[in-house]
């Protein structure tokens, strides 16, 4: 099992705050801001990264919706240290900082100690740091739906799944996909591969004869119609891709809701001893699934029913009987798993073929993210010349 220091001190907020402050909130919060200066910290210019561009799209949505109530500026790391860029943003008057990459956590923690009146948020999850709030989404909800679609659309019982990094929440997405596929195809088996390993994971799956593949989720609503190589797709005989269902992020919805919660006074209504992690699902609007218009009507209808059920809470992917790869019963089906149990999964369902890759095998560009957010981060030795987060 995963040993996460101070895990009990993490408060997972699984739903956005209410629309407005109550009487007690107004009393406890003598000063609720009327205007906020907001800084977005990027690892590179938006045109160089789809991930950064997606967050920049979210930044634009925030500005459009809140108008004169916010002043928003972007700060790009370039060749500078993250800490240096943060200090410049704070000196410029930033009240709120959105750090859009997990590699920024260490710099945010240091800055939060020096600037306790600035609100710091980092795009990560399951982090026990009280000075920096984390934000992310329950992607497993989307993967359950795309798994059901894949199970219905495969010509065989074998479906490929490309996971990005072995970090908190990834096994939950794999398992939810596997459970969804089993729901529509009882004999479905999921062949797991990893984008963090050398080589092309999609090509490896194709070489094994897999023709329905779940790739990583799409990072922005603006690209959901064009990036068919992401999401879940079928490879046709001529090599072209038939899109089936694509999970996608709407970061603008998340940024809008978080900033509105600050304006409503919700930010101060928590204990200072707890680390706050926002982990929202499809019901919040932060995540959704685009069902392809090319799906058969019945599969389209099923996908829509699953979307509605997950959003209203009547469908919970992990409220089912589950065995892991070693035959151990993980849930008897009488209850769902807690958010903490879901996030900390380090096992796979019995219809998944694959395992968590060793840290030593990862591509260098993935290593830092896994060192910070990885399932086995507590077992890693500190890097030479620096300490672990």
Segments predicted by a language model, with ranges:
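A residue-level marker of the well-folded mature domains of exported/periplasmic proteins
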Residues: 3-389
């Amino acid at each position: 099992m995963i040993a996460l220091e101070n895990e009990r001190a993490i408060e997972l907020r699984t739903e956005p705050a209410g629309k407005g402050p109550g009487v007690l909130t107004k009393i406890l919060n003598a000063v609720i801001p009327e205007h906020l200066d907001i800084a977005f910290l990027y690892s590179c210019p938006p045109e160089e990264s789809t991930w950064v561009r997606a967050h920049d799209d979210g930044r634009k949505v925030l500005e459009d919706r809140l108008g004169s109530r916010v002043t928003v500026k972007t700060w790009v790391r370039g060749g500078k240290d993250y800490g240096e860029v943060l200090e410049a943003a704070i000196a410029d008057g930033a009240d709120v900082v959105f750090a859009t990459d997990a590699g920024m956590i260490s710099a945010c923690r240091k800055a939060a100690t020096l600037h306790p009146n600035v609100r710091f948020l980092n795009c990560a999850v399951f982090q026990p740091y009280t000075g920096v709030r984390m934000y992310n989404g329950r992607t497993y909800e989307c993967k359950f739906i795309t798994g059901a679609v894949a199970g219905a659309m495969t010509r065989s019982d074998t479906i490929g799944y490309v996971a990005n990094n072995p970090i908190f929440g990834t096994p939950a997405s794999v398992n939810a996909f596997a459970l969804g596929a089993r729901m529509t195809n009882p004999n479905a088996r999921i062949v797991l591969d990893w984008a963090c390993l050398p080589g092309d994971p999609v090509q490896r799956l194709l070489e094994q004869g897999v023709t329905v593949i779940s790739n990583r989720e799409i990072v922005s609503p603006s690209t959901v119609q064009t990036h068919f190589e992401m999401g879940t797709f079928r490879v046709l005989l001529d090599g072209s891709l038939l899109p089936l269902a694509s999970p996608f992020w709407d970061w603008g919805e998340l940024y809008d809701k978080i900033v509105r919660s600050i304006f409503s006074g919700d930010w101060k209504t928590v204990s200072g001893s707890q680390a706050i992690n926002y982990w929202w699902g499809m019901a919040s609007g932060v995540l959704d699934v685009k069902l392809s218009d090319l799906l058969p009507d019945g599969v389209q209808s099923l996908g829509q029913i699953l979307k509605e059920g997950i959003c209203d809470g009547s469908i919970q992917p992990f409220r089912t009987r589950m065995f892991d790869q070693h035959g151990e019963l993980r849930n008897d089906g009488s209850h769902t798993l807690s958010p903490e149990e879901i996030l900390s999964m380090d096992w796979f369902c019995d219809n998944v073929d694959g395992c968590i890759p060793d840290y030593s095998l990862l591509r260098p560009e993935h290593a830092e993210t896994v060192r910070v957010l990885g399932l086995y981060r507590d077992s890693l030795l500190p890097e030479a010349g620096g300490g672990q987060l």
